[in-house]
C-alpha cells in the first residue's frame, strides 16, 4: 500500500520532467530575425512605429516557425511607451520574420493604412533604433 502511494506521488514528477523536455524541444534558436513594433491606444489618435530592427539570437517555435515569446517583445515596447514617453496602456503588436524583405513588406503595408491617402486622422510617430531597441528573449526553458 505504501509503495502504491509512493508511486502515485512520483508519477506527476515524471510527467513534469517529460513536459519540461518537450518544452525545450518546442523552440529553436536562429542567429537573427527582423522585427518592428506598432503601438496604439483606443483612447487617442497617436500611432507609433519602431524601425525595422535586427535582433540576434532569437527563438522560433518548432511547429510553425513563429517568434517564440512574442508577448515579451510586445511588453518591451509597451514598457518603453509607459516609462520613457509616459503613455500608459498602449496596445503593442510585433511583426517579425527571419527575412528582412518580408518584414519590410509588412511594414509598408501597415504604414499605408495609417499614412496613406485613405488614412484617417492619425498622428503617426516614429521610434528610432537609437531610442528603443528590442532585446532577445531566452525561450530555451519555455
Regions found by a protein language model. Give the residues of each.
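Bacterial Sec-dependent N-terminal signal peptides
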Residues: 1-21
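N-terminal secretory signal peptides
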Residues: 18-71
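Generic structural motif
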Residues: 41, 100, 127-129
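Extracytoplasmic/secreted envelope proteins and their assembly/folding machinery
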Residues: 74, 78, 100, 104-111
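A short, exposed loop/beta-hairpin motif centered on an aromatic-Gly-Thr core
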Residues: 88-101
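C-terminal partner/receptor-binding element of secreted or periplasmic proteins
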Residues: 109, 113-142
Amino acid at each position: 500500500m505504501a509503495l502504491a502511494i509512493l508511486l502515485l506521488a512520483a508519477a506527476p514528477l515524471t510527467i513534469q520532467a517529460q513536459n519540461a523536455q518537450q518544452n525545450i524541444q518546442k523552440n529553436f534558436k536562429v542567429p537573427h530575425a527582423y522585427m518592428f513594433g506598432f503601438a496604439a491606444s483606443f483612447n487617442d489618435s497617436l500611432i507609433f512605429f519602431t524601425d525595422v530592427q535586427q535582433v540576434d539570437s532569437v527563438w522560433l517555435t518548432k511547429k510553425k516557425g513563429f517568434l517564440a515569446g512574442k508577448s515579451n517583445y510586445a511588453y518591451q515596447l509597451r514598457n518603453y511607451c509607459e516609462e520613457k514617453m509616459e503613455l500608459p496602456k498602449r496596445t503593442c503588436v510585433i511583426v517579425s520574420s527571419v527575412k528582412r524583405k518580408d518584414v519590410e513588406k509588412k511594414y509598408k503595408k501597415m504604414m499605408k493604412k495609417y499614412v496613406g491617402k485613405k488614412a484617417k486622422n492619425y498622428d503617426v510617430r516614429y521610434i528610432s533604433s537609437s531610442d528603443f531597441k528590442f532585446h532577445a528573449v531566452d525561450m530555451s526553458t519555455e
